[in-house]
Amino acid sequence: MLSALADGAAAVRDQGVEVRRVLLIGGAALNPAVQAVAAQVLDVPVTVPAPGEYVADGAARQAAWALSGTRPEWTVSTRASSEPDLVPAIGERYRAAQALGSLPR
């Protein structure tokens, strides 16, 4: 799961878009180990928002943005967060294994 998320973030970065933070949503996001490892692998702060209807909210906000041309404000209340500097070796080992071709792409 986190490998695919890291690949997605890398693809976004390859397009010149800065990834400043990642929101983890879903059952696995509640696991503190997943939060910590995600921050290391993605090398950005990871936030777990309070429970909510984020998929529906996101779709509605995108529709409003497309129709109005104005980006809607979206405040997310935080349930938990993890910074990427907790265990730097995790991210380093992940990137080294990926560079060697040891991880699927």
Give, region by region, the residue ranges found by the protein language model.
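Glycine/Thr-rich phosphate-binding loops that ligate phosphate moieties of nucleotide
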Residues: 1-105
